[in-house]
C-alpha cells in the first residue's frame, strides 16, 4: 500500500485500483522489493505488469540487445508454453498448474536444451517480451503472475515486430 501513491503519480494505477490490480500489485511487490532502494524506483519495474499485453513498451536498450536468435527463441518458447497446462483447482480456483517452476522447466527444455543456447541468450528475448526492459523482476515468476494468455500475447507481440 505504500507503493500506491508513487504508482498513481507515475500514471500506472488509478487512485482507486480494483481488487484484481491490488492482488497483482501484492505479488509484484514481493518480487521487486529486493531490487529497489527507494519506492520511487518501483514504477519502472511495476509498470509492465499493468500495461496492455499487446502494447508493452520495449525500451531501446532492451530491443538493441536482442540477438540474431530472438525469433527462434520466441517461436520455441511460444510452442513450449502453449503446451503447458493452465488448469485451476482448489478453493476459488486458487491453485494453478501455471507456476514459475513449470514455466522454467518448459522454457529450459525448449530454448536451452532444444536450441542449444546459453541462458542469457535464450532468456533475453523472453525478458524483453514480458517486461519491455533489459532489467526486470524474475522472469518465470513474472510469467506466472501475468498468466498464460498474457505471456503468450506478449511473446507474439514482440515477435511481430522482428
Where are these regions (language model features)?
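Charged substrate- and nucleic-acid-binding regions of tRNA-handling and nucleotidyl-transfer enzymes
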Residues: 98-157, 161-162
Amino acid at each position: 500500500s505504500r507503493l500506491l501513491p508513487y504508482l498513481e503519480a507515475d500514471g500506472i494505477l488509478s487512485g482507486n485500483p480494483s481488487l484484481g490490480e491490488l492482488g497483482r500489485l501484492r505479488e509484484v511487490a514481493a518480487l521487486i522489493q529486493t531490487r529497489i532502494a527507494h519506492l520511487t524506483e518501483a514504477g519502472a519495474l511495476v509498470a509492465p505488469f499493468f500495461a496492455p499485453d499487446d502494447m508493452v513498451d520495449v525500451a531501446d536498450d532492451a530491443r538493441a540487445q536482442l540477438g540474431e536468435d530472438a525469433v527462434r527463441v520466441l517461436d520455441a518458447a511460444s510452442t513450449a508454453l502453449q503446451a503447458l497446462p493452465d488448469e485451476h483447482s482448489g478453493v476459488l480456483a486458487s491453485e494453478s498448474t501455471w507456476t514459475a517452476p513449470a514455466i522454467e522447466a518448459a522454457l529450459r527444455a525448449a530454448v536451452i536444451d532444444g536450441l542449444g543456447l546459453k541462458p542469457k541468450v535464450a532468456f533475453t528475448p523472453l525478458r524483453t517480451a514480458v517486461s519491455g526492459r533489459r532489467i526486470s523482476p524474475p522472469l518465470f515468476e513474472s510469467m506466472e503472475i501475468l498468466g498464460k494468455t498474457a505471456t503468450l500475447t506478449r511473446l507474439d507481440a514482440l515477435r511481430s515486430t522482428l
